[in-house]
Amino acid sequence: MVSDFEPAGDQPTAIKDLVEGVDNNDRTQVLLGVTGSGKTFTMAKVIEETQRPALILAPNKTLAAQLYSEFKKFFPDNAVEYFVSYYDYYQPEAYVPRTDTFIEKESSINEQIDRMRHSATRSLLERDDVIIVASVSCIYGIGSVETYTAMTFQMQIGDRLDQRALLADLVAQQYKRQDINFVRGSFRVRGDTIEIFPAHLEDRAWRISMFGDEIEQITEFDPLTGQKTGELKSVKIYANSHYVTPRPTLNQAIKSIKEELKQRLVELERAGRLLEAQRLEQRTRFDLEMLEATGSCAGIENYSRYLTGRQPGDPPPTLFEYIPDNALVFIDESHVTVPQIGGMYRGDFRRKATLAEYGFRLPSCMDNRPLRFEEWDAMRPLSVAVSATPGGWEMEQSGGVFAEQVIRPTGLIDPPVEVRPAKSQVDDVVGEIRETTKAGYRTLVTVLTKRMAEDLTEYLHEQGVRVRYMHSDIDTLERIEILRDLRLGAFDVLVGINLLREGLDIPECGFVAILDADKEGFLRSETSLIQTIGRAARNVDGKVILYADQVTGSMERAMAETNRRREKQMEWNAANGITPESVKSRISDILDSVYEKDHVRADISQFTDSAGAMMGNNLKAHLDAMEKQMRDAAANLDFEKAARIRDEIKRLREMELSISEDPLAKYADMESPVSGREKGKHNKGVAKHRTAEEQERFRKLDEARAAEEAARAARPNLFRKPALDEMGADGAVPAKKPLFAKPSIDDMGPGTDMPTPAGAVSRSLFKKQSASEAHGSDFGIPGEPVRPLFKKNSLDEMTVRRTEKPVEGKVPAKPQPISHPVGAGRTDVKDRDDSAKPIVRQRAGIGSYEDPGDARREKRRPGKTGRPGK
């Protein structure tokens, strides 16, 4: 383990207790660690002391990414892997009998996450020093470890093999031959050389050079540049999919599927359900033909029972079958993760049962499922539940014994908790927010519903408070952006519901307000209250106010636990002479996350880099990408999106210089409800919190800008705008003639917006003629008006799609529409109407170039940004 810190506070005791429990084979242990006490550090130390492989279970991808990043730093020389769901978008197949609606399966797989999953299983099979950070997706089925291992083969220099046999083995492992588009999971052949891009590697591939039927050389190279990076003596090639199946197993599975289909068809026909029988036979036989021909089919996971050789009701093969018996499982935020594991099975079972009942799938599809809680409990190795608020199951399994980690290494104590009446909670919150902002800290406000969050945000915005809201309608990348901007000080208050809880690291937060704290429920339970109170525990001046008209049991227990921890922490600090200090963490930590690789689409205004990184070549590359998006949107006739991207490009180019000096510059022109005078005061308040060095830097920047503007004003302007007297006075000669005169409004019709040489101001071909010009006083034939060279278009000529010359004289009458002779004399047949009709767009995907998946995603996402008034 690599770290600059040594265990402090309660950490040494907790590490010792947990290591003793592992040595004594205690199956379940509990680590009760408060927010900011270094639970991740303790887990890493336990792994180092026990020298065992470990699986870290996180409740969501955000915390999984955070843990992955931290363990990567703690163990740079070991195999730290990431195993989460690889779907960017997933719509499972389903049937709604009430409306007779069948929804096809639709998904989008993230290549980067898929590669990391392959890397995780490979590390488990090859190494002992493995740490896997996983989400709850690890209890879902993947390929059998026996089959996956059996399909693996090794090659080394000097081996003799047939080239055709090697290519056949690669195809059996579901590698694809790509002679041109050489990507992960593919291979190509060039004479006696075979190049393989393994499924678990990102920027390296292998070149197998053969002499006849003997392997002469194995080279590692960069697939992008072709540059050689190393020489290898042997390589082990793993399958391109966890669901790969050997041909004998596949043939046996096809026989079993046909047998089940035969029995199921007899059942449906006896019940008189002929439609379901016909549907099931058609769909299943198509899948069987695909399996026989290619070894795979769409929805192959529904036949996983036969492909893995399991019996009905057996647990599916999961990541837990790859984990060695001596491994440790750390369940992070166990009060959330454990109920998640228990809740995955039933919803999945109900959906698949409906599909089987109505003939869309065979009944065996219900064996493609996540683990039941009982199966997971029986399968898990030695476990440590880590939480500030352990649940009932964890405490029951550990016999009520737990390792406590209440003392923080920084000496911070839990924030004081105060109860105030809820009748005037909003006005009281506004006053507290102003005091907190004046001290330079941020505020978190938690409410009960999305509507309350948005309404409270609007009200605070009207009161002159810089505020945002965050709830489940906000896109995940937008949430990261909001948290980063809150820490930067771009706004002062964040209103949320259930997202302001586990794992939220905001050391700048000095005040947490919990509105309607007496409304009993899962949002105001003892666990939720303690977790929310913990958000203010990273700041030495943090405080929490519960707004309630009565003290509920959950509030009483939460305050009692918080006070117990405060007393213990204060005693420790007094005994050891520790002065508490706020937690310091880099703002970029929240963005340096593998979690961002789990997204492929984001709104154009969402930036995953910090402001300082969006400069120079990075900004240029970003602008180039946005310009490509703009052109693509225009090509797809989505002109509104193209215009938004164009405006964003323009704004970024204008901000390039200012962002490099001031990270808050992009909020300088943000809409504000207060007047200009108050706005100036508010900006002064922001500047007040800057250090002397920052204020000096901004002063020099302002002086440089002022000097540049003065120099620009001193230079002669060849293209200056003419003054009013120059534009309206007849015959007036300006003191300084510009090279180009601005035409009048009357002369600025279509096709007339051309500049006029300054020397011919009075001879303008586009200006309205004065009285002297009409009598030819300046040039031309005396007494005759001067005719312009270009005629001004009339209204008829300026209409849309009227570029032809208007017809002189009488316009011919419109001919009668042609009627079909078959319909002559019949009143029920209407003549065809040749008049222009509006273009009616069909639904997405019908006779058009639009992507139905994109259309559904646009309908599903409300596109909220957390800003008031949007």
Swiss-Prot record:
What Pfam families does the database record attribute to this sequence?
Helicase_C, ResIII, UVR, UvrB, UvrB_inter
Subcellular localization is given as: Cytoplasm
Q: What residues does the Helicase ATP-binding domain cover? A: 20-410
Annotated ranges, domain Helicase C-terminal:
425-591
What is the top-level taxon of the source organism? Bacteria
Q: Where does the record place the region Disordered?
A: 671-698, 741-870
Alphabetic keyword roster? ATP-binding, Cytoplasm, DNA damage, DNA excision, DNA repair, Excision nuclease, Nucleotide-binding, SOS response
Residue ranges of domain UVR in the record:
620-655
Main subcellular localization, coarse class?
cytoplasm
One of the record's GO molecular function terms: ATP binding
- Read off the InterPro entries from this record: Helicase/UvrB_N (IPR006935), Helicase_ATP-bd (IPR014001), Helicase_C-like (IPR001650), P-loop_NTPase (IPR027417), UVR_dom (IPR001943), UVR_dom_sf (IPR036876), UvrB (IPR004807), UvrB_inter (IPR041471)
Extent of motif Beta-hairpin: 86-109
Q: Which family does it belong to?
A: Belongs to the UvrB family.
Q: Relate the assembly described in the record.
A: Forms a heterotetramer with UvrA during the search for lesions. Interacts with UvrC in an incision complex.
Note on domains (UniProt): The beta-hairpin motif is involved in DNA binding.
> Which named protein is this?
UvrABC system protein B
Organism of provenance: Mesorhizobium japonicum (strain LMG 29417 / CECT 9101 / MAFF 303099) (Mesorhizobium loti (strain MAFF 303099))
Q: Its encoding gene is what?
A: uvrB
